[in-house]
Amino acid sequence: AVKSDRVYGLLTHPTAPCLPAVLAVAEYKKSSSGKDFLLAYNLGIEVETKIAEAISPRHYQQGFHATGTCGVYASATAASKLADFPIEKILTCLSIAGSQAAGLRENFGTMTKPFHAGKAAEAGINALELTELGWTASANILEAPRGFFQAHGGSYEPDSILNVLGNPWTFNNPGVSIKPHPSGSLTHPAMTALSDLIN
């Protein structure tokens, strides 16, 4: 699979789960404006990246793939925002999505790795539909003793989320970029140097 996600200085690839979810809801809703679309997309990216920054480094060290685990929150946030949910329903949607958070680094280098992002996108849409059907879920899926942060890393850094959502917007700082090569970012300097030598 070509890995063409946009990421720079982040701990996850937020576009991969977020954009498909926003596109699906926009196609279904049809009354959304471009401004609504961009706001939902940016909110999804913001939530995913801040959660990825807040979770303990053990999350990654223990084998979790943040694009799959944190990405469910991007797709659920973006989808529920574009669906114009009130805050209570957004929280329910996030909680339902959180119960679907998955992705293991053991599958890096296989065809299953990009599947993580696709399942994270799907999780947000499933959560949206279940919320619309009246499903209930915890209002504290992230910080509860048996919630996401404890289950997936053992702890979290509240300062990475509280009072920093949208301040600054991740889309602006550190920003997003298009990968110059369809591979992991650690290989990019060598690939760029090799391309320069060939050219």
Model region roles, listed by residue range:
Residues 43, 47-70, 92, 96-100:
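Flexible glycine-/small-residue-enriched beta->alpha junction loops
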Residues 1-53, 58:
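Hydrophobic alpha-helical hairpins/lids featuring a short glycine-rich hinge
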Residues 66-68, 72, 77-199:
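Functionally critical mobile loop/hinge segments
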Residues 10-16, 36-41, 59-72, 112-117, ...:
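Active-site nucleophile and cofactor-binding loops and adjacent substrate-binding regions
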Residues 1-7, 50-62, 104-110, 167-176:
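Glycine/charged-rich beta-loop-alpha catalytic/anionic-binding loops adjacent to active sites
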